[in-house]
Amino acid sequence: MDIHRCRFVPYNPQAINALAFSHPPSLGLGGKGVPTLRLAVGRANGDIEIWNPMRGAWFQETVLRGGKDRSIEGLVWTLDPPETGPDGQQQAGRLRLFSIGYSTTVTEWDLEQGRPKRHSSGNYGEMWCLAAQPRWQAATGKDNKPLPAAEGEYTGQHLAAGCADGSIVLLSTADDDLKFLKTLRPSTKRPRVLSVTFQNRHTLVAGYADSSIRVFDIRSGQLKRTISLGKGPTGGSKELLVWSVKCLPDGTIVSGDSAGEVRFWDAKNYSLIQRLQSHLADTLDIAVSADGETVLSGGADQRTVVYRKKSGEKGDKSSRWAEVTHRRYHTHDVKTFAVYETKNLSIVVSGGPDASPVVLPLREFGKEHHRNLPSLPQVPPVVSSPSSRLVMSFWDREVSIWRVSRGPTSLHEVPDGQRHRLVGKVMIQGEENITSATLSSDGKILVIATVSSIKVFSVRRRKGDDRGTLRIQKLDTPETISEDGARLVTVSPDSRWLCIVRPNNDICLARVKPASSPQEKTQVMPQLVNLRRAVRHARFEKVSHGTLGGYERTIRCIVFSHNSNILASGDLSGCIDTWTLEDAEQTTIKKPNTNADADESSSEDEDDYAAVEGQRWRPIASDSPIPRLKSSVALLSFRPPSPAQSNTILTNGTSASKTISAETRLMAITTEHQLVEFDALQGKLSEWSRRNPRAFLPADFKGVRDRAMGCLWDFSDSRERIWLYGTSWLWMFDLRQDFPSTEELNEVVAAEANDASDQQTQKQSQKRKRSAQDQDDDDKRKKKPNSGTGAGGQLPLAQSDVFFDSKARAFVGPDASQGEIVSLGKERPVDEEEEDEEFNENNEIQLARVRRENAKSGSGDSNQLVSTSTPARRWWFTYKYRGILGIVPLSSKSADLDADTDADADGEASANTGLEVAVIERPMWDVDLPDRYVREYE
């Protein structure tokens, strides 16, 4: 594979200003979080990223795009009260997301459509902070049963926003709305409100810019107490800025100020309990654990400091807070925290101007690794036109196109000048950021979409320009297409169909007429073909978990087959829908309904299956679609046509003579890194996918933490490879082979059988206590890549801050003749989902073994045909690339080749030439960050 390492794309990751989990910490909840748990990440350009923790896997599901001069400075989630359904049962309330951004407006976001749902603004100052009222908890009666809410009691959550004019605005979220409730003002003095939190459902605590903390009763609107922090340090400002206030479960107030101090205040009389000086610069944010035993602070000195309660000496029941440790996980300010905890999960996420969210273990701090989440988007904002050697990238409201020249083909050839050149640039009008952009495979059509509009451009090379500059001209787009925006756009490989995924996840297709001569323009037909997805049953959600509505049906990816005759889409719920293009005269549409409802919707069906220039799109097996996958669909890609013959013999002895056509095989990569290949026309698994379940994947691949971003195909007469890549890794699988091979699998089965018989014999012969080495070996064998409390894996003892192991040997008796291994750490309860996964994995292994045996017996003497040749490498991987923005293919057969070139010779050369790609990197050390605090020794 020929690789061009490119760092010329000036993509600028934006600072993280706000973090918020959709659910509050709950130590009484088992497992690693509820299914609806999400993390919202607010950035300085107005984008909001929605991350799914996935019990430690961390997957970026979608991005809510911002706009010009917009910023996210605060994020909160609320849960609406449950409603009573028609059947009398309670239905889960909706989870709602709100944001502020240095304006007088609070914005509610529509997660299903990916754009703002409503705004609330008023005659008050700019909002600097935002907090949500704690969720309503039912009181228990004498029989320990929950009591209903009192008459007239509001069980929802109000919002409190602190403003620059000193006021605190209360907003009501009742009745699925956002309305002004009241304003809290301390006095005639108007200091900025820098931080706000709730001590309980009726008490509000706010930090100001005048060295004070004020406590309000939101029911009466009265000021209960003003807490003074005193003067600032000598040589600095007289007034302290209270950047953060948080409350422990017992009501204790914790504050962080511009002097770098963390102070603890009594919950009842609001007196100072303790003050700690742990930062060299401002303390910007504070995080507290669910049990109130751990506090974290982040500052402008890049430090993350951990405090824990230290019990007094014997006879002293009082406890004091002490700094346990501090460390620099960020290269810039630590600006914001978000905490989530259950019985099995305990994490805190931090962020700042260095753009990378950092996941830290909270309960197991010092015993587990931290983890840096990617700062780059997980849907690559880069597309290429291989034949034209054009690379397109977009960010904010800008699109840039580069031309990558060919490298030297031999050691004696001298490269001529610059290897890349900027040949085109587009700045779109309006305020919305670009949601999606694509370049056709021939490099002649450019499509740019925002949340409110779609623009189509023709791309041509300027005549007489030796530099290869492009002429980008806007085309007349019909109103049926441009009047609404899109979350995804793509162009078919033959450049005849434009696919649009609307913000509400409706799929539309428009016919494109390419220009037949240089004097003509490419035309986009006004008629839209609306495609319907198969109806799927929604997953049941518990009332306490809340619901995200139709957010799970958000389309993650959409792709055409290589002959442009099949279209496939995948969504966050794991559903895959497919459609095929057929001649209108030969297509007969089956009406699923035969009652009166069918007559009413007949006109809609005709529009959905309307013919365009004699062709019609229809769903494939709408009555029995492809089964839903276990996790979200991360990638979809059709297998390209292989130049090899259909009777190719696999190197592990399996005949491919009966395999399905390569044009219809669809590869799906899930967020759990499961590779599933379907026949798109028949809706069944391919033979390769049947023989290779996820349990057979290499252990190194299953241990990869960053999720896959994209894939490339490398097909020729001698190889069938798929290349997967993430932010920091690149992996190759040879699809002509199974992994592990049949011989290796038989050896594993025999070894497992021998181990089982040996263990049974040992149990019958003697019973002994397990040694420490046996116990450690079992622990290492049982650990999974995403084990732990949600951050990184277990820290080795030599790198741990705890300085003692998690196990010790306890001796019984005066002569120490009996010993027992005792665990010093708290044993976490077993996760039921992990037990189910292990059970399903064992079933998949047994089923795959049977399929391989059947394939081997059906292939006859095929083993003898390949026994003389050495099998090629089944997989390969590397971690040498950092900050991968995307990897795009390039073609050695360019559109600029002379017309006299022999087509057959070119086809033979391209079939035998290796894959050529451009690896676009954007490491953080190449990004210009704002000024930061400089320490004395720097």
Regions found by a protein language model. Give the residues of each.
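Long, low-complexity intrinsically disordered regions enriched in Ser/Thr/Pro/Gly
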Residues: 2-30, 38, 45-63, 78, ...
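Solenoidal tandem-repeat scaffolds enriched in leucines and small polar residues
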Residues: 128-263
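N-terminal intrinsically disordered, low-complexity segments enriched in Ser/Pro/Thr/Gly
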Residues: 35, 92-96, 128
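Asp-box/WD-like beta-propeller blade repeats and closely related beta-sheet repeat scaffolds
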Residues: 122-126
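Short, conserved, GDST-rich strand-edge loop motifs in beta-rich repeat architectures
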Residues: 86-90, 144-152, 655-656
